[in-house]
C-alpha cells in the first residue's frame, strides 16, 4: 500500500491581510483534493507564548514530518518562509 505524501505549506504571513490565510487554505484545499496530506500552518492554534519564534517552532516541527514543501507566491520576501525553504531543500 502506497503511503500518502505529506506536504508542508510555506509562504508569507506577517504583514499580509488576514495573515495570508486565504491563500494557505486555498492551496491546502487544492492539494487535499489530489490526495495529498497537507500540513497547513494557517490551521495551527497559537503557541502559548504568542511570539513569532513560538509560531516558527510549531512550523518547523511540522516541516520536519513532511516529505515535501509547497511554496506560496511571495515566499522569497518572508523571513519565516525563507528559513523553512532553506531547511527543506
Show which residues each predicted segment covers.
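Conserved catalytic or regulatory cores that recognize and/or transform ribose-phosphate-containing ligands
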Residues: 1-89
